[in-house]
């Protein structure tokens, strides 16, 4: 999906990854991340958000819940980390990093609510009154007031499978009335997902029905005299979409893919955020005229299409296609069109969620001053593997 953008925006990352692979320092099935470019992307996002008065929570799941990289990004001015599930929150808190938003996309499990509240999470999203009551009890126990967001939806909204949740908009007044009765809770705002999506036909990011539901819910509360301070609208957050969010009065957004430049809008390599990540593998064997590279990093929604194959003997890079991958099977190997020498390196660049892969994550610094070095090596869940 992003091979051309990678070649255009960050050819030095390709060269650095291949060089370190030749030295035996990077193994197949590794996501190789250009730390300096991620930080530059992160800085651009912060600067753009400030221009429009939008606060940013940092999303880490796309780059493997990596605490080292998260700490560097937080130093740029992000308002804390959004943990999309309780396991991500655990990784970040073990690294002593601030989790600002928890409960969306995945609710906090019952026996972890107390800890989430006690740790000082800025806002917790709730999908049910039952969960709100758990948060209330934890807040009372901790002797603090916990801010919460309500996830809302309407019947015609778009919800990804596995993410069906929230309070239906027409019940909002009744829900808010119940929330107000619960001690230790402060209704801080509303959220939904996805609020923006890339439209291939239009060639740009457009609002979803979900964003309109979110705005209607805010207005519905305002008419009843209930003011909220946070309107959180995640999905497709980037330098070019932040102005659109500002038009709708959004106060908070949660960039993820934009940090690595792997947003659909950047397929041609023409966005402010530059590609900062690639996946490196190696030819394992041939079968019936095609080559197979080591798998483990495939993501079925990643739109991976093209690959670069590097043969050390002649220092040649050849472009080929990734053949159809059966999404119902484990990606032990991935098929590439044509035969290439065994043990040639393979580079792909596609949209990923590293935390659902089996990949290693290799952090590189110094690429653009001609001195690439590995500054960290992690698994896909943010656990250090040593330098």
Pin down the residues of each PLM region.
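Glycine-rich tight-turn/loop motif centered on a GG-T
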Residues: 23-34, 118-124, 159-166, 201-208
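C-terminal accessory subdomain/extension
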Residues: 290-387
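Aromatic/hydrophobic pocket-lining residues that form π-stacking "cages" and hydrophobic walls in ligand
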Residues: 45, 135, 214-217
């Amino acid at each position: 999906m992003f091979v051309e953008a990678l070649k255009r925006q960050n050819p030095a990352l390709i060269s650095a990854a291949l060089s370190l692979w030749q030295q035996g320092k990077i193994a197949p099935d590794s996501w190789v991340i250009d730390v300096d470019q991620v930080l530059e992307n992160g800085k651009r996002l912060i600067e753009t958000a400030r221009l429009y008065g939008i606060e940013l929570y940092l999303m880490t799941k796309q780059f493997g819940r990596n605490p080292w990289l998260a700490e560097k990004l937080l130093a740029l001015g992000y308002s804390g980390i959004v943990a999309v599930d309780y396991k991500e929150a655990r990784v970040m808190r073990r690294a002593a990093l601030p989790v600002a938003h928890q409960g969306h996309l995945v609710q906090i499990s019952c026996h972890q609510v107390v800890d989430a509240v006690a740790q000082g999470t800025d806002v917790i999203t709730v999908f049910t009154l039952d969960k709100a009551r758990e948060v209330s009890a934890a807040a009372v126990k901790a002797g603090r007031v916990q801010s919460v967001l309500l996830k809302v939806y309407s019947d015609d909204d778009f919800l990804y499978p596995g993410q069906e949740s929230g309070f239906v908009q027409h019940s909002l007044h009744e829900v808010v009335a119940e929330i107000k009765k619960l001690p230790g809770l402060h209704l801080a705002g509303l959220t939904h997902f996805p609020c923006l999506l890339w439209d291939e036909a239009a060639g740009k990011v457009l609002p979803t029905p979900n964003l309109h539901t979110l705005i209607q819910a805010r207005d519905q509360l305002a008419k009843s005299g209930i003011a909220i301070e946070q309107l959180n609208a995640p999905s497709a957050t980037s330098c070019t979409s932040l102005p659109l969010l500002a038009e709708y009065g959004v106060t908070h957004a949660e960039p993820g893919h934009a940090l690595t430049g792997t947003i659909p809008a950047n397929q041609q390599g023409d966005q402010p955020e530059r590609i900062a990540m690639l996946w490196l593998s190696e030819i394992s064997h041939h079968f019936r005229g095609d080559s197979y590279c080591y798998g483990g990093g495939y993501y079925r929604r990643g739109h991976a299409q093209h690959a670069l194959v590097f043969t050390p003997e002649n220092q040649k890079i050849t472009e080929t296609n990734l053949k159809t991958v059966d999404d119902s099977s484990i990606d032990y190997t991935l098929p590439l069109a044509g035969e290439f020498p065994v043990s040639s390196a393979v580079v792909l660049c596609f949209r990923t969620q590293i935390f659902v892969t089996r990949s290693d994550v290799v952090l590189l610094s110094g690429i653009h001053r001609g001195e690439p070095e590995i500054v960290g090596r992690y698994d896909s869940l943010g656990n250090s593997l040593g330098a």
